[in-house]
């Protein structure tokens, strides 16, 4: 199967993410929390607040973690995939790829998911849709009401708790990954497209910061199949 332009673009994004995360991981051993008075850590926290594209709810949250999380989520380009597509990623007239400045992220779609990456094993098979990472207004938990422990497992192992696209062998539909192709077949228990094999090298402290930041951003209502209709109500 010849890769589609979308898959090629995703591959380029994954390579960039791998290089970026290699630099982050090399400077901070896994599990090491930021030390008090760490100038580099303090500067990242401050920069995170400066570049946050949406208002942040800091009530009941660790401010330093939120700032660091904002920094990591922004430089890792999480919104490049976890929005509703290129046409809605930026506020009209503020798209840097069109030479428009200042750059301004569209808060109405920020990390709300819904980008369609197409199929990865040929039809019939499911389209991979990026997930909504914003928090539920009912529980305050981000990324589909997942706890921090769930979030760590997702990033470390790629486990798909939602199990949106199981494997199938008998009746093949557009919602499941067939077990007879490709060879080896796609594992329906794992997230596809999402570059978790790169992100799994993030430190425990970095993952805590990212999760805390996702708790602090505004809820964005999902608009794609499988997304709860009442996330923000």
Predicted regions and their residues:
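N-terminal secretory signal peptides that target proteins for export/translocation
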Residues: 1-9
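Bacterial N-terminal signal peptides
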Residues: 12-23
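Electron-transfer interface patches adjacent to heme c in soluble/periplasmic c-type cytochromes
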Residues: 96-156, 160-164, 197-207
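Boundary at the C-terminal end of the N-terminal hydrophobic targeting segment
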Residues: 26-33
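Detector for the c-type heme attachment site
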Residues: 81-87, 156, 195, 215-216
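The canonical Cys-X-X-Cys-His
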Residues: 69, 75-85, 122, 151, ...
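Surface-exposed intrinsically disordered loops and tails
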Residues: 41, 45-51, 88-123, 162-185, ...
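Electrostatic cytochrome c docking/interface patches
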Residues: 44-74
């Amino acid at each position: 199967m010849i890769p589609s332009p979308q898959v090629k673009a995703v591959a380029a994004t994954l390579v960039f993410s791998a290089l970026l995360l290699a630099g982050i991981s090399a400077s901070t051993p896994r599990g090491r929390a930021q030390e008090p008075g760490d100038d580099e850590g303090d500067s990242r926290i401050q920069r995170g607040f400066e570049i946050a594209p949406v208002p942040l709810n800091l009530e009941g949250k660790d401010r330093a973690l939120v700032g660091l999380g904002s920094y990591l989520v922004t430089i890792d380009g999480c919104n490049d995939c976890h929005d509703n597509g290129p046409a809605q990623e930026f506020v009209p007239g503020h798209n840097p790829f069109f030479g428009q400045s200042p750059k301004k992220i569209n808060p109405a779609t920020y990390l709300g998911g819904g980008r369609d990456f197409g199929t990865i094993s040929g039809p019939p098979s499911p389209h991979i849709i990026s997930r909504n990472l914003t928090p539920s207004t009912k529980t305050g938990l981000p990324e589909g009401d997942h706890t921090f422990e769930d979030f760590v497992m997702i990033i470390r192992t790629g486990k798909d708790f939602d199990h949106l696209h199981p494997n199938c062998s008998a009746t093949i539909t557009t919602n499941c990954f067939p077990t007879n192709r490709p060879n080896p077949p796609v594992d329906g228990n794992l997230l596809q497209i999402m570059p978790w094999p790169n992100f799994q090298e993030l430190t425990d402290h970095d993952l805590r910061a990212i999760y805390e930041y996702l708790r602090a951003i505004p809820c964005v209502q999902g608009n794609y199949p499988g997304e709860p209709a009442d996330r923000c109500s």
